[in-house]
């Protein structure tokens, strides 16, 4: 009777779960028989192609918004819109995440596809070499699925077989006991993928070296949560193999990797590609929620000296994701006298032409600059909102700068010239190279500026920080940035640049400062065009490394957010001297924006405060996000383990 009841319970659980389309499916969705699919390499390969799409989009690795939304949860980015109550990101403030939030607890349909690849390829009559490759791809895709669950929630149901109604025991598979067990599954699958994948692969499919980038990434995350030194060794071995044996160098065209000019650059080891026949601007938040919406009437009302001249409204999107001044400050500037790479406000060209003013002297709206638009509405620096809803314990205004009377250059030129080369490829800034062929001005009254539309503080589908993202946007759209325009688009998922970053971090964790600095200097000098770091202490090296990763990997998947979780787990120099596992300082503070005067001779940098934006918070429970409570409740109903993560 006990066996009978357990079987009924397992079947009932299966039936309850398959009522949801994306769960424990036990029947193939294809009309082809298993024999037809798996005894022909071409049909098996087609199934794997479909599984790549399912896994990469289903986990969010190549999902719309995966770059910009997770970046908005770090000091690099901001999500903000005053249109229709869209507001700000709820994870950055922790006001919008509860145990009902789903971060991917139920990935059974994805795992079923991966397990079918592994099982059916093993049992097929294909050549051994074909079997090995297909199995390796199945392990790779399953490893990615497990990894996404591990780094977000820490624990998951590790299904490694193709379930059927008769699998009563497998249907009761428990959650992994802890993060340590979870990462064993992740690392085991990715390691198997590395051993079985070919050295090269077509665009959109994983090679051995793509798998090694993911493996090194996963090993760093695993080490942060388990402190097992073996993961550092594997991270180093994997990253070095990519660097030394792939035969692929860092590209000289960093920006081209992320737009239409060089989408299959050799440095890209794995990308996700969509063609315009079935893709439109609206399908990608990196486009539709980044490009602004600005009308010719807005520009004329704001007295812009550069407006649309062709009659075509180039920017007709719904921008709500923007880079911050915190991000921009990471990009160093080459000193014109010494050649050293320095923060913009420490260079000789800055000191010769500008001076800092006490920020405490800024006390009222419009004090720095102000003008009236044609309709009589005012635009001010600072705005009234800039002085309200600030986060205590942090300066309201971080920097107030003005040109010296003798200055022959304006502040836009001083701040943005001779920057790290990745800056111009990543950020749209005042007077930058034309965007969609249109000259951009972001100073007070500028054509795409904060106050160019109805709201003085921006967020009316236009910038709220003084910047826009350029990385991952397209440079040419016909006829404009509009929701239904067809586009070729791609996401970069793994590349050689990350291998250098992962190597540098692992070497730092082992105390090998010189090796870490050598690794980070590759991207810093080749992609950034900067003088190399000369850091010689652990503290200096961590500072330069974190800066380098933020620049190199900005707005690239979820990299920076999960890097911050690692750095918080490490503590010490990786998190401002705090103890391991303490609050992540940079995720617990406000972010800053820039406001540039009309004549570009004054700049004010202050907190982004509108709609509670300054109220960013990080509590330690966020090191592991919640396992969706509804998922756990279903498990509890059938007598299965259902423990929630601490604090949720």
Describe every region a protein language model picked out.
Residues 150-157, 201, 221-227, 511:
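Short coil/turn linking the two alpha-helices of tandem helical-hairpin repeats
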Residues 40-59, 80-153, 171-184, 188-203, ...:
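Conserved, well-structured interaction surfaces
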Residues 20, 52, 107-108, 185, ...:
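Long, intrinsically disordered, low-complexity segments
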Residues 20-71, 101, 116, 134, ...:
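Acidic, glycine-rich segments characteristic of secretory precursors and extracytoplasmic regions
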């Amino acid at each position: 009777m006990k066996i009978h009841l357990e079987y009924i319970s397992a079947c009932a659980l299966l039936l309850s779960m398959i009522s949801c389309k994306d769960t424990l499916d036990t029947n193939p969705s294809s009309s082809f028989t298993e024999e037809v699919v798996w005894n022909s390499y071409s049909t098996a390969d087609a199934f794997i192609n479909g599984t790549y799409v399912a896994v990469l989009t289903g986990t969010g690795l190549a999902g719309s918004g995966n770059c910009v939304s997770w970046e908005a949860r770090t000091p690099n980015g901001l999500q903000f819109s005053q249109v229709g109550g869209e507001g700000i990101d709820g994870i950055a403030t922790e006001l919008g995440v509860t145990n009902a939030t789903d971060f991917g607890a139920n990935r059974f349909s994805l795992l079923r596809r991966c397990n079918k690849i592994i099982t059916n390829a093993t049992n097929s009559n294909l050549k051994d070499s074909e079997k090995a490759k297909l199995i390796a791809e199945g392990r790779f895709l399953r490893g990615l699925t497990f990894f996404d669950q591990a780094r977000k929630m820490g624990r998951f149901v590790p299904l490694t077989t193709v379930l059927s109604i008769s699998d009563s025991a497998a249907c009761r598979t428990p959650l992994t006991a802890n993060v340590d067990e979870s990462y064993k599954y992740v690392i085991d699958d990715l390691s198997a993928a590395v051993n079985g994948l070919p050295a090269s692969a077509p665009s959109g499919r994983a090679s051995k070296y793509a798998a090694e980038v993911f493996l090194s990434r996963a090993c760093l995350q695993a080490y942060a949560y388990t402190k097992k030194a073996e993961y550092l060794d594997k991270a180093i071995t994997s990253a070095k193999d990519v660097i030394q044996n792939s035969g692929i160098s860092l590209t000289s065209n960093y920006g081209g990797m992320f737009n239409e000019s060089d989408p299959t650059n050799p440095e890209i080891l794995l990308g996700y590609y969509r063609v315009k026949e079935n893709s439109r601007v609206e399908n990608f938040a990196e486009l539709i929620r980044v490009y602004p919406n600005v009308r010719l009437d807005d520009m004329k009302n704001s007295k812009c000296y550069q407006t649309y001249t062709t009659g075509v409204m180039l920017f007709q999107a719904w921008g709500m994701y923007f880079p911050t001044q915190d991000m921009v400050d990471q990009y160093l500037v080459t000193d014109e006298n010494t050649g050293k790479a320095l923060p913009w406000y420490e260079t000789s060209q800055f000191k010769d032409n500008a001076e800092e003013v006490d920020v405490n002297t800024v006390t009222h709206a419009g004090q720095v600059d102000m003008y009236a638009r044609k309709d009589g509405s005012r635009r001010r620096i600072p705005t009234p909102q800039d002085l309200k809803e600030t986060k205590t314990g942090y300066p309201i205004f971080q920097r107030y700068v003005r040109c010296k009377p003798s200055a022959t250059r304006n502040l836009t030129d001083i701040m943005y010239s001779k920057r790290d080369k990745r800056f111009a490829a990543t950020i749209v800034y005042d007077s930058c190279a034309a965007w969609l062929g249109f000259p951009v001005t972001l100073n007070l009254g500028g054509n795409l500026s904060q106050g160019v539309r109805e709201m003085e503080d921006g967020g009316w589908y236009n910038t709220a920080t003084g910047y826009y993202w350029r990385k991952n946007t397209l440079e040419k759209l016909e006829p404009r940035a509009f929701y239904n325009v067809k586009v070729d688009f791609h996401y970069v998922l793994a590349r050689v640049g990350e291998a250098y970053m992962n190597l540098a971090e692992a070497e730092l964790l082992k105390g090998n400062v010189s090796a870490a600095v050598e690794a980070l200097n590759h991207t810093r000098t080749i992609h950034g065009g900067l003088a190399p770091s000369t850091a010689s202490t652990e503290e200096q090296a961590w500072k330069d490394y974190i800066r380098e990763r933020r620049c190199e990997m900005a707005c690239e998947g979820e990299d920076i957010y999960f890097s911050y979780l690692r750095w918080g787990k490490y503590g010490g120099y990786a998190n401002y001297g705090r103890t391991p596992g303490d609050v992540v300082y940079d995720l617990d503070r406000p972010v800053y924006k820039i406001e540039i005067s009309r004549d570009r001779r004054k700049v004010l940098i202050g907190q982004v405060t509108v709609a509670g934006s300054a109220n960013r918070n990080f509590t330690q429970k966020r090191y592991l996000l919640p396992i969706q409570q509804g998922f756990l409740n279903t498990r509890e109903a059938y007598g299965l383990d259902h423990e929630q993560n601490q604090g949720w």
